[in-house]
């Protein structure tokens, strides 16, 4: 109960801070550092979608909604060469924390590989797909997942548990120092750190130089 009270108080305090925080109204063109949830938001919006790490087959008719794709064939570099991305279907715990992505068989009856490399050292290696063949994913990877909110057994291409690994990553303190240095080199008086991207509830912090 005490932990619950602490969590509720922390949540309330954060809401008050957001309400009282000044709005950013001036134009800003300079370096920005993404941290915490902002990093995952950018990753999800750019990679965890159809036409990126999820295979996508363009419809035959123009009436269907268009999907923006990576337009990068397998074997091309799509991200920094220190980054590797893997998909795990059987990983049910990580550091003792239960995960929701583990499954033994997908919605179309296909048994997925336990581990699948999607990006290796920045190179686009493979994409997740269901039973509908596409140009770069002609076979199913066992990645058809039932929608949690669906009552009609609907499913779509989705991952198990995505693991992102960065070789020789930089510590947060050095990243902040690099941000300040870059802002000073551009003659700016401040820079921004973004820790959450959620519309009006986004958490953006100004760092005065």
Labelled PLM ranges:
Residues 1-209:
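N-terminal small-residue-enriched
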């Amino acid at each position: 109960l005490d932990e619950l009270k602490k969590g509720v108080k922390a949540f309330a305090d954060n809401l008050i801070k957001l309400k009282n925080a000044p709005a950013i109204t001036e134009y800003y063109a300079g370096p920005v550092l993404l941290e915490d949830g902002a990093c995952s938001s950018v990753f999800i919006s750019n990679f965890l979608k159809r036409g990126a790490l999820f295979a996508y087959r363009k419809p035959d008719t123009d009436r269907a909604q268009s999907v923006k794709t990576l337009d990068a064939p397998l074997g091309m570099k799509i991200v920094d060469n220190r980054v590797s991305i893997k998909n795990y279907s059987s990983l049910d715990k990580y550091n003792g924390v239960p995960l929701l992505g583990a499954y033994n068989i997908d919605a179309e009856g296909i048994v997925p590989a336990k581990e699948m490399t999607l990006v290796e050292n920045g190179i686009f290696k493979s994409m997740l797909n269901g039973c509908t063949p596409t140009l770069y994913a002609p076979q199913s990877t066992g990645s058809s997942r039932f929608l949690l909110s669906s009552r009609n057994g609907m499913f779509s291409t989705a991952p198990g548990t995505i693991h992102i690994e960065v070789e020789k990553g930089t510590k947060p303190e050095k990243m902040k120092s690099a941000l300040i240095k870059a802002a000073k080199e551009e003659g700016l008086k401040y820079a921004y750190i973004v820790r959450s991207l959620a519309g009006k509830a986004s958490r953006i912090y100004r760092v005065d130089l």
